[in-house]
Swiss-Prot record:
Pathway: Carbohydrate metabolism; D-tagatose 6-phosphate degradation; D-glyceraldehyde 3-phosphate and glycerone phosphate from D-tagatose 6-phosphate: step 2/2. One of its GO terms (molecular function) is tagatose-bisphosphate aldolase activity. It comes from the Bacteria. This is Tagatose 1,6-diphosphate aldolase. It comes from Streptococcus pneumoniae serotype 4 (strain ATCC BAA-334 / TIGR4). The gene is lacD. Keywords: Lactose metabolism, Lyase. It holds the Pfam family DeoC. Transmembrane segments: none annotated.
Length: 326
């Protein structure tokens, strides 16, 4: 992958001195609202969502290499970032049409790569739901959509992070044993597709290739993969792309995510960092709603800091520099 000078400078801003991306994700919108309504009866307000993002940015970006936010509720938080932290902004609308299995991509209406760059972002992030076994017609539509965003990012000379969430059109429950059995094929297959230079993607943000809760030694119930099988899937995922790639935390606990990274490294996965969200800050939501901003800050300073500090220690032992892949 040939990086322009501007893209390289921006990727360096997003990573630490070792070329590892230890990014904090708080671009959640729908997921954040769902977390909030567990603790309050009224609809979450814009002010509440903005304030939560600001306090997390303010308290934790001094320990992260960068932060991912959304332009809908996250712009005030972009002003609270530590001066050394890079900024990614999400370009996609939250969620997808649940009346269809297509999960078509959709950009935020009043945003563009140009506007994201003007807001001070060092990268554009876009989330795509992709089923490698969907019809060619549907997947060509999705691929063309990603080509457009890639071309925008080339025009603006800004890095393009594509987040791929694999799924199966015929399996509704992504946490099921049924989906766990096909997940490696879905995740690795999608990575292969979007590693093609035609998409102009600079970094892939991906799921781990297995549901770790069904791996021997991690599983509390049914085992779908032996440790050897799971390790082989991590290795196959690494070999599926020549692009830098980082793992998303997918809402699992901080400890399970850290253990997963160690397992990935031991399996031969040369991943280049993480974009970790709920595993770091989820506890602050309840504190914020029940006891206010000061309580939420205290939660972030203690539990949130511990989570990010432990994660950083694990990353230094397990992740590799993105510069080795470009």
């Amino acid at each position: 992958m040939a990086l322009t000078e501007q893209k390289r400078v921006r990727l360096e801003k997003l990573s630490d001195e070792n070329g590892i991306i230890s990014a904090l994700a708080f671009d959640q919108r729908g997921a954040l609202k769902r977390l909030m309504v567990k603790h309050q009866t009224e609809e979450p307000t814009v002010a509440q969502m903005e304030e939560l993002k600001v306090l997390v940015a303010d308290e934790l970006t001094k320990y992260a290499s960068s932060m991912l936010l959304d332009p809908e509720y996250g712009l005030p938080a972009t002003k609270a970032l530590d001066e050394k932290a890079g900024l990614l902004l999400a370009y996609e609308k939250t969620g997808y049409d649940t009346t269809s299995t297509k999960r078509l991509p959709d950009c935020l209406d009043v945003w563009s790569a140009k506007r994201i760059k003007e807001e001070g972002a060092d990268a554009v992030k876009f989330l795509l739901y992709y089923d490698v076994d969907s019809s060619d017609e549907l997947n060509q539509e999705k691929q063309a959509y990603i080509e457009r965003i890639g071309s925008e990012c080339v025009a603006e000379d800004i890095p393009f992070f594509l987040e791929i969430l694999a799924y199966d059109e015929k399996i509704a429950d992504a946490g099921s044993v049924e989906y766990a059995k096909v997940k490696p094929h879905k995740v690795i297959g999608a990575m292969k597709v979007f590693s093609d230079p035609r998409f102009n993607i600079d970094v892939l943000k991906v799921e781990v290739p297995v549901n770790i809760k069904y791996v021997e030694g991690f599983a509390e119930g049914e085992v779908v993969y032996t440790r050897e099988e799971a390790a082989a899937f991590f290795k196959a995922q690494d070999e599926a792309t020549n692009l830098p790639y980082i793992y998303l935390s997918a809402g699992v606990s901080a400890k399970l995510f850290q253990d997963t990274l160690v397992f990935a490294h031991e399996s031969g996965a040369n991943f280049n960092g993480v974009l970790c969200g709920r595993a770091t800050w989820a506890g602050s939501v309840e504190a914020y709603i029940k006891d206010g901003e000061a309580a939420a800050r205290e939660c972030v300073r203690t539990t949130g800091f511990e989570n990010i500090d432990e994660l950083n220690k694990v990353l230094q032992r397990t992740a590799t520099s993105w510069k080795e892949r470009v």
